[in-house]
């Protein structure tokens, strides 16, 4: 039997994101650096502003664009109700997208995401996970669950899911090796 080719990470990630954004029903959602294709689809039921260092050329009702860096977001402290950043922070500081090399790029990006999310606001976040913190040079980093939760200290973990291979799991299973973690968190 021949199957339709799919990239499982983005299939699971985008479905997970859509479910939560639909359930949350924010008046306006903000996304930093994720897929323009995904945000375009989701903008059809929730107004979305995308923030990225690379502008998009297309226009779509309910989809707005703001040029900006995840290291210096163009928003006031505690100003955003719902925020997402899907498979983005693991690239920051590795030079892959023309950014400067910085061994703490991911940590600085997370600090900035935390800064702009209002108290009581919800963060939808995904990153590669592994059995230890690693750098796959010039591609991305991978993190342990404990390290991610440490970086989001002061946030309440509402849900976590993990993708390994072609399956989703409800718990972190480091013995499975490389995967992707999906986290829904509320700022306390």
Stretches with model-predicted labels:
Residues 111, 139-162, 178-182:
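Short alpha-helix
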Residues 23, 28-73:
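Class I SAM-dependent methyltransferase SAM/SAH-binding core
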Residues 84, 89, 93:
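A conserved beta-strand element that flanks and buttresses the S-adenosyl-L-methionine
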Residues 103-104, 125, 130-147:
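Acceptor-substrate binding/catalytic loop of class I
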Residues 1-25:
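Class I SAM-dependent methyltransferase Rossmann-like catalytic core
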Residues 168-188:
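Core SAM-dependent methyltransferase catalytic element
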Residues 101-122:
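A short glycine-rich, Lys/Arg-flanked "PGG" loop and its adjoining helix->strand segment in the class I
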Residues 71-83:
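A short acidic, Gly/Pro-enriched loop at the edge of an enzyme's catalytic core
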């Amino acid at each position: 039997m021949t199957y339709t080719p799919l990239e499982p990470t983005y299939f699971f990630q985008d479905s997970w994101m859509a479910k939560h954004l639909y359930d949350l029903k924010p008046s306006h959602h903000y996304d930093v650096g994720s897929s323009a294709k995904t945000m375009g689809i989701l903008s059809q039921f929730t107004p979305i502003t995308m923030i990225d260092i690379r502008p998009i050329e297309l226009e779509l009702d309910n989809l707005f664009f703001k040029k900006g860096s995840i290291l210096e977001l163009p928003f006031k402290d505690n100003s955003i109700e719902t925020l997402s950043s899907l498979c983005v922070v693991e690239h920051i500081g590795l030079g892959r997208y023309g950014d400067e090399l910085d061994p703490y790029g991911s940590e600085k990006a997370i600090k900035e995401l935390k800064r702009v999310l209002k108290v009581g606001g919800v963060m939808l976040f995904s990153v590669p996970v592994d059995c230890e913190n690693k750098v796959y040079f010039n591609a991305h980093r991978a993190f342990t669950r404990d390290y991610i939760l440490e970086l989001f200290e002061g946030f309440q973990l509402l849900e976590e899911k993990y993708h390994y291979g072609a399956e989703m799991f409800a718990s972190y299973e480091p013995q499975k090796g490389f995967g992707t973690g999906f986290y829904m968190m509320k700022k306390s």
